[in-house]
Swiss-Prot record:
Signal peptide positions (record): none
KW tRNA processing (keyword) present: no
Organism of origin: Methanocaldococcus jannaschii (strain ATCC 43067 / DSM 2661 / JAL-1 / JCM 10045 / NBRC 100440)
Protein name: Uncharacterized protein MJ0149
One annotated Gene Ontology cellular component of this protein: plasma membrane
């Protein structure tokens, strides 16, 4: 369970940074990295709460 949570956090945040970096390279605006990093963190917490809710149902 703990490994799944860590994996979900890492994937969401890394994906956000990666997408933000790609957009930042094309637009020459590094603000996109921060925006997608925060979006990745938000999605990671959303997945965490969903995993906790699913775990409590069992």
């Amino acid at each position: 369970m703990l490994r799944d949570i860590a994996f979900e956090f890492f994937i969401m945040i890394a994906l956000g940074i990666f997408i933000g970096y790609i957009i930042a390279e094309y637009t020459d605006n590094n603000l996109w990295i921060v925006v997608f990093l925060l979006l990745g963190i938000f999605c990671a917490f959303g997945r965490l709460f969903k995993m906790i809710k699913d775990y409590e149902k069992r």
